[in-house]
């Protein structure tokens, strides 16, 4: 399964580890992903999403129904 947030579409970023001597070695910055179940009252079922901590805060702010509508508008199947 890819490491992508279903709400924010955040993906791993690439950069460098920098040692004390400023040697650069490539590394990946991974998103803070969690698998979380949300109860959707309008559909009378649970929906499982793989999302970042920021994605959870967006759902708290907008509501699960609005966020699911945006995800489905992008063409993702839930």
From Swiss-Prot:
GO terms for cellular component: cytosolic large ribosomal subunit. Keywords: Ribonucleoprotein, Ribosomal protein. Transmembrane segments: none annotated. Residues 1-20 are annotated as: Disordered. It comes from the Bacteria. The keyword Ribosomal protein applies. The keyword Ribonucleoprotein applies. GO terms for molecular function: structural constituent of ribosome. Gene3D superfamilies: Ribosomal protein L28/L24. GO terms for biological process: translation. Belongs to the bacterial ribosomal protein bL28 family. This is Large ribosomal subunit protein bL28. It comes from Haemophilus ducreyi (strain 35000HP / ATCC 700724). The lineage of its organism: Bacteria, Pseudomonadati, Pseudomonadota, Gammaproteobacteria, Pasteurellales. The gene is rpmB.
């Amino acid at each position: 399964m890819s490491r992508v947030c279903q709400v924010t579409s955040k993906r791993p970023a690439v950069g460098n580890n920098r040692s004390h001597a400023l040697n650069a070695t490539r590394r990946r910055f991974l998103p803070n992903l969690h698998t979380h179940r949300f109860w959707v009252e309008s559909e009378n079922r649970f929906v499982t999403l793989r999302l970042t901590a920021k994605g959870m805060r967006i759902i708290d702010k907008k509501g699960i129904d609005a966020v699911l509508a945006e995800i489905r508008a992008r063409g993702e199947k839930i």
